[in-house]
């Protein structure tokens, strides 16, 4: 648990994430810590109403790859959205088109059938661009400068992606001096006094996702 005044304030009011699409990308280094953080993140997202089918999880080898992966995930979600919108537009414009013999050709139905076959076996869920993406990693200081270089590069990289794309990026990178600090921040320390920061990241993603939608419409959401 947090001591003193340190820790996140509870979001006010509680935000409803049922309409959101959230991305998660996590490194695979320090898997015990990462797995617990991922569980905490998902727990928080589900508690806020985010549907499992609207959560996309990707993995990368290490934390250094997180900024690139976040950017590419967001671009991929934009591509999905454009493809879906384009298919709907074609179907709508061709509905009820009359042929030269005066009969009515239902091209919309044909297009819909082809689209269903194309999507067969694909994951169900929203194809909207991500409302927020959570980047999860855990760096533990060693005997070289590797820790400092990676921490700095990833921190600046994630901020740059957030500002360049306009997609909210939740900073889920733990920069740890010891393994014990990581266990505590993943809520799996032996003493049981830790707090799973993944729960905070999930709540932050929902809040930012809801506010981002409001801001894009000129509305200030509390």
State what each model feature region is.
Residues 13-17, 122-128, 161-165:
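Solvent-exposed alpha-helices and their adjacent loops that cap or buttress functional pockets
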Residues 67-80:
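Charged, often glycine-rich, active-site loop that binds/positions anionic groups
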Residues 77-129:
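Intrinsically disordered, low-complexity domain-flanking/linker segments in eukaryotic proteins
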Residues 131-133:
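Conserved acidic residues
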Residues 141-143:
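Short glycine-rich, flexible loops that bind phosphorylated cofactors or substrates
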Residues 12-61, 65:
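Glycine-rich phosphate/diphosphate-binding loop of Rossmann-like nucleotide-binding domains
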Residues 136, 145-222:
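C-terminal binding/interaction regions
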Residues 1-21, 113, 189-193, 207-209, ...:
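N-terminal presequence-like segments and the immediate start of the first folded domain
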């Amino acid at each position: 648990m947090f001591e003193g005044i340190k820790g996140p304030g509870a979001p006010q009011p509680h935000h409803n994430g049922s309409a959101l699409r959230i991305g998660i990308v996590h490194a695979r280094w320090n898997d015990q810590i990462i797995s617990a953080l991922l569980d905490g993140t998902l727990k928080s997202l589900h508690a806020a109403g985010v549907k499992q089918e609207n959560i996309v999880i990707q993995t990368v080898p290490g934390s250094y790859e997180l900024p690139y992966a976040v950017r590419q995930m967001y671009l991929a979600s934009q591509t999905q959205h454009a493809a879906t919108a384009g298919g709907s537009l074609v179907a709508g414009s061709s509905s009820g088109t009359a042929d030269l013999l005066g009969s009515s050709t239902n091209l919309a139905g044909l297009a819909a059938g082809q689209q269903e076959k194309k999507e067969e076996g694909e994951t169900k869920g929203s194809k909207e661009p991500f409302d927020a993406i959570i980047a999860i990693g855990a760096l533990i200081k060693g005997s070289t400068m590797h820790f400092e270089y990676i921490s700095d590069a990833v921190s600046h990289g994630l901020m740059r992606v957030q500002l360049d794309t306009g997609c909210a990026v939740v900073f889920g990178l733990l920069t740890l001096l010891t393994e014990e600090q990581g266990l505590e921040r993943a809520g799996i320390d032996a003493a049981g006094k830790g707090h799973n920061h993944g729960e905070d990241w999930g709540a932050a993603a929902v809040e930012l996702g809801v506010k981002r939608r409001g801001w894009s419409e000129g509305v200030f959401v509390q």
